[in-house]
């Protein structure tokens, strides 16, 4: 999950600990090793050396070289491989096995998230809410966040317009813009409008929490993975990052709790008077509607939404904008499409769907550089044997490599960025559905593959199209001279580098975007 998050992680030293605790950690690891059941016989790419007591070195190596190892192996092999990762052992399957893998009910994403992000510990409240049996977060994302799009598309566009002007300026001279940093701020503000509403989305303290909590979660989660699970409930109390994480959660509650209490009191008063309560167009309202009186962690739910939505959307927004800037002959056709479609239909989900060239550009960016080199990570709830005899032990991770997205047997000239690739695919009735950014299949698993696909991809697609449309109409963009491709590779992640920049200048709008139309 997170480019800037993961870069920030590397600036932290792993927590130093008393010798006694280290000795206990080693002892527990050895005991756990002895108690293991049947193990996979699959080759381990980065095995522990015979003289090593722990897998620490192997885990650190995977953090550094994981994407390169996975890409190198699956570019030449169509068979699975096992790695030691920072969560333990993980079997990576080739994408040719994705169809079978996605249908295995006992490969559980929630178990992976609960273990990897320590949902039982204070500070990881967002992941505790995600992993609740009611799956309230998933229901809100899949249902209301999609069905309510006609109500929030125009407010999203209005906020984007105002925010972009502040971040990118009004100078008509070429200037260097920190496009990743600006993109992160832009996505944070637009996401929070739909998450917590107009009142809180302008609260600078909340924006700071929304943007930085994910960094704190990733840092603390990684530090704790050094420890055996039995020691983590003790270790986190002594780590500075753990204190910071818990403080962010406390601050979040001080902002969110009064607002939800106000809304509940407002609703009760309206019901008592026999009048219709106000209906807010944000996830705070939709969580209340979906919970239907059942208890849930209000602040935890919002922190979960921010963690899931901000950094992944920022990565695709920045990646798509950089790719477009590197192909100047693409900008005028995109502007013409935006002017025509938005000029005729205004800011509606239907209009965003008609931005077919922009959609194709975004999907091609994701094909060239998926945000993870292996997706659909899940934990086995029982011993699992696949149809080819591959054994995945209970409690171990498995994932699917994204190798098919750059396979020359699937794509013509896969190494080349072709912005019209998926637009052409839409002309084929058999491929028109899967050619759209929001839809998934085995050839393009940038968002995973149903039922293991990212549930927030529908919102992300609309949000990013709105942001790109504003940028392209209002600004000229081009690469910074001498600025080569810069990706940040870490463990499973391949992200746009947080230092990514572009040259921008304000342009005179010949056809203003019609914010006065729905």
Curated annotation (Swiss-Prot):
SUPFAM superfamilies xrefs: Cytochrome P450 (SSF48264)
Alphabetized CDD domains for the sequence: CYP503A1-like
Primary localization class, coarse: endoplasmic reticulum
Induction remarks: Expression is induced at the beginning of the stationary phase, which is consistent with the timing of compactin production. Expression is controlled by the ML-236B/compactin cluster transcription regulator mlcR.
Transmembrane regions listed in the UniProt entry: 32-48
Annotated cofactor note: Binds 1 heme group per subunit.
Principal EC category: oxidoreductase
Keyword Isomerase belongs to the record: no
Positions in the Cytoplasmic compartment: 1-31
One example GO MF annotation: heme binding
Annotated Gene3D superfamilies: Cytochrome P450
Pfam families: p450 (PF00067)
Reaction catalysis annotation: dihydro-ML-236C carboxylate + reduced [NADPH--hemoprotein reductase] + O2 = ML-236C carboxylate + oxidized [NADPH--hemoprotein reductase] + 2 H2O + H(+); ML-236C carboxylate + reduced [NADPH--hemoprotein reductase] + O2 = ML-236A carboxylate + oxidized [NADPH--hemoprotein reductase] + H2O + H(+)
EC number: 1.14.14.-
Domain of life where this protein originates: Eukaryota
Biotechnology: Compactin (also known as mevastatin or ML-236B) and the intermediary metabolites Ml-236C and ML-236A are inhibitors of HMG-CoA reductase involved in cholesterogenesis. Their hypocholesterolemic activity might be useful for lowering cholesterol levels in the blood and reduce artherosclerosis and coronary heart disease.
Pathway recorded for this protein: Polyketide biosynthesis
Parts of the chain on the Lumenal side: 49-518
Cofactor(s) listed in the protein's UniProt record: heme
Family: Belongs to the cytochrome P450 family.
Primary role: Dihydro-ML-236C carboxylate monooxygenase; part of the gene cluster that mediates the biosynthesis of compactin, also known as mevastatin or ML-236B, and which acts as a potent competitive inhibitor of HMG-CoA reductase. Compactin biosynthesis is performed in two stages. The first stage is catalyzed by the nonaketide synthase mlcA, which belongs to type I polyketide synthases and catalyzes the iterative nine-step formation of the polyketide.
UniProt name for this protein: Dihydro-ML-236C monooxygenase mlcC
Lineage start: Eukaryota, Fungi, Dikarya, Ascomycota, Pezizomycotina
